[in-house]
């Protein structure tokens, strides 16, 4: 465990290791979180102590499971992937709340559902599709 407020920093818990740089006591740049076997489970990007840009979380085989985009510590976009790397979920955020387009996919890559969020709540017409692409149902919010 490091106690410095500048430079390289490492911290270990029972299950995970955290490693990155500190600047004035705040995380800065790329931080890697690894499990006990040394496998990277997450890679986070910090600027001035806040999450900034793309952070990624990984399946045990190294494939990206989740990608979250941050601006000044707030989520702006969220993508989740199936274990083969196929896109599963896409969400837009504003000020840390779901806001904007939302899309969900079958493991085949075909669109499962789509709609919009406004200030964290579903709004408008949401469409859900069969794997063939035909509309299965519509819900209004």
Identify what each model region corresponds to.
Residues 1-141:
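Glycine/tyrosine- and acidic-biased, solvent-exposed loop/turn segments at the edges of beta-strands
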């Amino acid at each position: 465990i490091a106690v410095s407020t500048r430079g390289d920093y490492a911290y270990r818990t029972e299950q995970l290791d955290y490693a990155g740089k500190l600047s004035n006591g705040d995380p800065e740049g790329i931080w890697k979180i690894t499990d006990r076997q040394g496998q990277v489970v997450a890679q986070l990007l910090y600027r001035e102590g806040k999450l900034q840009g793309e952070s990624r979380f990984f399946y045990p085989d190294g494939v990206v499971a989740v990608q979250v985009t941050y601006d000044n510590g707030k989520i702006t976009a969220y993508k989740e992937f199936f274990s083969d790397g196929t896109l599963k979920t896409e969400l837009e955020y504003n000020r840390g709340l779901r806001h904007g387009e939302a899309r969900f996919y079958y493991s085949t890559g075909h669109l499962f559902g789509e709609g919009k969020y406004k200030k964290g709540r579903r709004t408008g017409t949401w469409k859900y599709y069969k794997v063939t692409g035909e509309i299965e149902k519509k819900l209004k919010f």
